[in-house]
């Protein structure tokens, strides 16, 4: 069964690895070794196949089995979020007791990890395994988490599962229009791209190209040219969400990809502001727009360099955040693009440059101030 471009088994394994589990075991009902199909699904991962009658890692992990070991059991029909699996790995639980939820996910802390692995190798279904372990260790309820996992009952649940996964891709740090308009479009595109071989980096380059193509249209003072450039700018912003969505959806995140995405986005902003400045200078025959443009570009690059680490972490503000931190957060959103579209429809995109020449340096100073207050 394939869910959002990945076989469900591989998705479960990659989520477990992303959650920080040191070992991921996959139970195979195939006797006499792992099934070749499972081997292909696990290719490139650190997962090990657990077959009937075999208990891999027991000997090599001998010293570790004497200590308390956290084991999470997940049926093959449950689509997990990595953060949910991480919470199962880290939460405090009563030892030597099986904690289970309605989706047949279970967690146990035990010094007898070998017994759990042997039972997992012996029983072919999650229901049988959970029943046997509950009889041995006793049972306790594990709080159900509809946000953290999606239980599939049949192939017909594939579309709802994909919708659930896509909704989880919406970031904490998003403006109103980005969350309620752009994300709806980008997620629809990502849903169709997920089964293909299109990579996140490829989408970053497509988005970058569209944004850079749109920038020169702001050299003109004609409304139709400016509006076309603004619509390309908006298209860039929408498609800019697809690369990160694909990366998170298919576990393809990388530092290289995050850097390419972040600086590609800011390169488009610099190009748009620079072209607005040159266009206004050509229209007025004055040099001061070039100074305003230079100030905006320098502040944009400085703000990007300063804020890049926090932005890529996707951290949300706490409830007790100061008003300056909240104001800096609000300035970082890209809802300003819609103002560019409206102004461009009247041939007044240059007005936005005037606003940006004040707002962008202000944002940069706010970042410096917030950072200084946090260090104090």
Which ranges hold each PLM region?
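Alpha-helical transmembrane segments of multipass membrane proteins
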Residues: 192, 212-216, 340-345
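A feature for the membrane-embedded catalytic helix bundles of lipid/isoprenoid biosynthetic enzymes
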Residues: 96-97, 101-187, 262-376
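Short amphipathic alpha-helical coupling elements at transmembrane boundaries
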Residues: 187-195, 244, 248, 258, ...
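Residue-level signal for inorganic ion chemistry
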Residues: 9, 77, 199
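Conserved beta-loop-beta/alpha segment of the NTase-like Rossmann-fold superfamily
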Residues: 35-107
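N-terminal glycine-rich phosphate-binding loop and ensuing alpha1 helix
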Residues: 1-39
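Membrane-embedded alpha-helical segments that form the functional core of polytopic membrane enzymes
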Residues: 200-256
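Juxtamembrane helix-boundary/capping and inter-helix hinge elements in multi-pass membrane proteins
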Residues: 53-60, 250-256, 317
């Amino acid at each position: 069964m394939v869910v959002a471009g990945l076989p469900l088994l591989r998705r479960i394994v990659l989520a477990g690895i992303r959650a920080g589990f040191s070992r991921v075991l996959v139970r195979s009902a195939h006797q006499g070794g792992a099934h070749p199909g499972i081997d292909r699904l696990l290719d490139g991962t650190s997962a090990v196949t657990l077959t009937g009658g075999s208990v891999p890692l027991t000997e090599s992990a001998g010293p570790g089995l004497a200590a308390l070991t956290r084991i999470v059991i997940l049926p093959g029909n449950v689509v997990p979020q990595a953060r949910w699996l991480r919470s199962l790995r880290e939460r405090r639980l009563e030892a030597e007791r099986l904690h289970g939820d309605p989706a047949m996910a279970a967690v146990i802390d035990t010094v007898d990890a070998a017994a759990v692995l042997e039972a997992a190798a012996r029983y072919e279904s999650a229901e049988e395994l959970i029943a046997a372990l509950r009889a041995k260790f006793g049972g306790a309820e594990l709080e159900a988490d509809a946000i953290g996992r999606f239980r599939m009952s049949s192939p017909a649940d594939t579309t709802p599962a994909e919708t659930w996964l896509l909704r989880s891709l919406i970031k904490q740090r998003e403006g109103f229009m980005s969350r309620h308009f752009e994300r709806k479009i980008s997620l629809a595109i990502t849903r169709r791209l997920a089964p293909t071989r299109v990579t996140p980096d490829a989408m970053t380059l497509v988005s970058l190209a569209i944004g850079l193509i749109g920038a020169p249209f702001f050299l003109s003072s004609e409304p139709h040219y400016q509006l076309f450039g603004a619509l390309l700018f908006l298209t860039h912003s929408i498609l800019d969400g697809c690369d990160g969505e694909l990366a998170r959806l298919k576990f393809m995140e990388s530092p290289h990809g995050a850097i390419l995405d972040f600086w590609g986005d800011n390169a488009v902003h610099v190009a748009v502001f620079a072209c607005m400045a040159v266009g206004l200078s050509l229209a007025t025959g004055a040099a001061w727009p070039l100074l305003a443009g230079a100030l905006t570009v320098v502040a944009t690059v400085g703000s990007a360099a300063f804020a890049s680490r926090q932005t890529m972490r996707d951290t949300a503000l706490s409830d007790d955040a100061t008003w300056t931190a909240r104001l800096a957060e609000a300035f970082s959103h890209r809802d300003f693009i819609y103002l560019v579209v409206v102004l461009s429809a009247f041939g007044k995109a240059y007005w936005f440059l005037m606003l940006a020449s004040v707002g962008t340096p202000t944002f940069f100073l706010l970042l410096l101030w917030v950072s200084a207050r946090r260090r104090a």
